[in-house]
């Protein structure tokens, strides 16, 4: 069975207009989490004053993407960003998007909501109907397929923080199983209103000072953040550029837990990774680095680290390096998996 590879990648992350800027900030240890009023007044409703924000989400080349001005003004900025960054990802793979028209290319997008849709729908007398088309999560994938004339599967996935990696898994398996020859996989998250943050704060999930102190004793919650990342997956024979090969992908869920539905299970994470490695012949000692979920919460970090230690550190080996993008840029929730993947791909590309 032919290998599936990452053939192109593009993204916008906090204070980073593209992946080159993102990489430079990672290398220089720049804190991409900021305190300003680009979304709402810092400290409103007692919220943490800092979060991770994209530089500018106000502009969109509507005519280029075949979007009528009336539609563009009521289209979720998340979808506008996905259209733009998907184009960049395909070009990054050395492919002219026009050559993919009519092909079985699929689209999978990880996203968890549309705060813009709620805002655009507040006044029934002002509704034009376009916000329903521009803000439905189904359209996050379908509009991409429509613009490029892709004929493969097209769907949006919401599994909260794992959404974009679930999208990646589904796309990978679709290519492996012959449902499509290539796939555009995206993850997106924007913070457009304070209400969602207030709910997370009330649940005790947010760091009061707006920082993900990953794997640190001072960890007291996570910092919310924005991101949009898109990768192009293809069969190896189709790729003009190869960043990395995906050797396996899978998922499970924790089931019932006494501590509640939001409590993570390090044991289930360990079981999943162990089974995936066993399927493709990877030994624990072969792994040199793990890019973790690592959000800086008092509950999640210990569960994850203990699971990794049980899996990878029960044999003689060199030290296992671990890390998390969230200590640099905050937690972009449904887009976090692809943001982490971007960091790893960039590290490989630069020989680190």
Curated annotation (Swiss-Prot):
User: Biological process GO terms, please?
Assistant: fatty acid biosynthetic process
What keywords does the record list, in alphabetical order?
Fatty acid biosynthesis, Fatty acid metabolism, Hydrolase, Ligase, Lipid biosynthesis, Lipid metabolism, Multifunctional enzyme, NAD, NADP, Oxidoreductase, Phosphopantetheine, Transferase
Quote the EC number: 2.3.1.85
According to the entry, every stretch annotated as the Ketosynthase family 3 (KS3) domain falls at 1-352
A Pfam family of this chain: ketoacyl-synt
Enzyme type, top EC level: transferase
Q: Which residues form the active site?
A: 161 (for beta-ketoacyl synthase activity), 293 (for beta-ketoacyl synthase activity), 331 (for beta-ketoacyl synthase activity)
Under the heading PANTHER family, the entry gives: FATTY ACID SYNTHASE
This chain's protein is named Fatty acid synthase
- Species name: Anser anser anser (Western greylag goose)
